[in-house]
């Protein structure tokens, strides 16, 4: 089964959207959740995926080596972005979609969570948070998803690179 670049980019987007309500928050003692700050550090941290955990995050039917080669090829073609410095051979790294897609998703996630009463100082109980997280992910997908699909269509090559 051939996996296209489009499918990989959309898998990165889906992983980002599903994780955002959890990684844009802090988990506190007493099973409470509060918003993380809305600065650049937390935006990067919340929207990046570690190359070591790519298989679990992306859930693509690719081997370990093949998924790594394909992600690196997308980075080389500037379809994905490396967070932080460029990795040396054999090192793990963090990758993500460009900031023009992830920053609006991060900001919208925080705005929606504020709508549920969560702030940096007002916490929500962890019990029942999965339902809130799913609603937030769905809302982010419906609002920012069309921009991502447009980006993916622009990025998709007519001739896919097979490594």
Regions found by a protein language model. Give the residues of each.
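Short, amphipathic alpha-helical interaction segments positioned at domain boundaries
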Residues: 99-131, 135
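Short helix-coil-helix linker/hinge
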Residues: 2-6, 18-22
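Short alpha-helical "packing" element that flanks the helix-turn-helix/winged-helix DNA-binding module
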Residues: 7-12, 31
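A short, conserved structural fragment
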Residues: 75-85
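Short, Lys/Arg-rich nucleic-acid/phosphate-binding segment
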Residues: 84-93
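Short intrinsically disordered terminal tails
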Residues: 1, 157-163
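Short acidic, hydrophobic short linear motifs in intrinsically disordered regions
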Residues: 21-57
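Short amphipathic alpha-helical interaction segments
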Residues: 61-76
């Amino acid at each position: 089964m051939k996996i296209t670049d489009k499918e990989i980019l959309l898998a990165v987007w889906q992983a980002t959207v599903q994780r955002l309500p959890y990684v844009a928050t802090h988990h506190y003692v007493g099973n409470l959740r509060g918003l993380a700050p809305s600065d650049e550090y937390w935006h990067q941290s919340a929207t990046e995926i570690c190359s070591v955990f790519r298989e679990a995050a992306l859930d693509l039917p690719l081997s370990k080596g093949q998924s790594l080669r394909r992600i690196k090829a997308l980075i080389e073609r500037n379809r994905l972005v490396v967070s932080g410095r460029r990795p040396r051979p054999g090192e793990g790294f963090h990758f993500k979609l460009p900031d023009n897609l992830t920053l609006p998703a991060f900001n919208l996630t925080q705005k929606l969570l504020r709508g549920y009463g969560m702030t940096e100082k007002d916490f929500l109980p962890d019990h029942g948070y999965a339902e809130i997280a799913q609603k937030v992910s769905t809302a982010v997908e419906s609002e920012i998803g069309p921009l991502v699909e447009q980006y993916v269509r622009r990025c998709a090559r007519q001739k896919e690179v097979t490594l």
